[in-house]
């Protein structure tokens, strides 16, 4: 056996062993960029939905706290920057929800049930009740916050239109109860 063939065989065997070992631990080690391959709703359409969720569900005694499985970050509750107060009125010192907070809330929601979320999105958002957060908000499962939305109302349409890939921003604004702030640009 030539030296080049021996080296190639050893490298190939080592690669196979390494690959098998990586497969064995792949579930316990997150990828370096923490991304997983699932179908998910369009994040660029999420800010109006996030504003509604922050207003309705993101108070510090509900989903605006770190200990919850579904955490909401935004100007009305939990902030990523500890120097930001949970207050949206920019005219009185409040600060709008940041792009990083929209992203954190998006990841929290999409990551709750990634396989189910992928199934709902692949189906064009036709079966939103497969998702626990929709069932709880509709009062179909126990929820400390009670029933929050009714199928077909503006609050429900805000969420389900986003899941279907075409966010109804009018429904989100109506559900919020006041005009939304423009989404701030991401910083450098």
What are these regions (language model features)?
Residues 1-26:
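Sec-dependent bacterial lipoprotein signal peptides
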Residues 27-188:
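Aromatic- and Gly/Pro-enriched helix-to-coil junctions and flexible linker segments
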């Amino acid at each position: 056996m030539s030296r080049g063939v021996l080296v190639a065989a050893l490298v190939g065997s080592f690669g196979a062993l390494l690959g098998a070992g990586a497969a064995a631990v792949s579930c316990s080690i997150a990828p370096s960029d923490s991304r997983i391959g699932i179908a998910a709703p369009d994040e660029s359409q999420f800010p109006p939905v996030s504003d509604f969720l922050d207003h309705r569900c993101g108070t510090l005694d509900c989903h605006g706290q770190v200990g919850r499985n579904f955490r909401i970050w935004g100007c009305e509750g939990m902030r990523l920057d500890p120097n930001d107060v949970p207050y949206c009125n920019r005219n009185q010192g409040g600060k709008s929800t940041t792009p990083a907070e929209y992203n954190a809330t998006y990841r929290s929601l999409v990551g709750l049930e990634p396989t189910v979320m992928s199934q709902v999105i692949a189906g064009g958002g036709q079966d939103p009740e497969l998702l626990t957060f929709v069932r709880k908000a509709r009062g179909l499962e126990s929820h400390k916050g009670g029933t929050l939305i009714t199928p077909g109302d503006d609050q429900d349409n805000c969420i389900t239109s986003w899941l279907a890939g075409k966010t109804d921003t009018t429904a989100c604004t109506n559900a919020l109860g006041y005009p939304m702030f423009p989404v701030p640009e991401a910083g450098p």
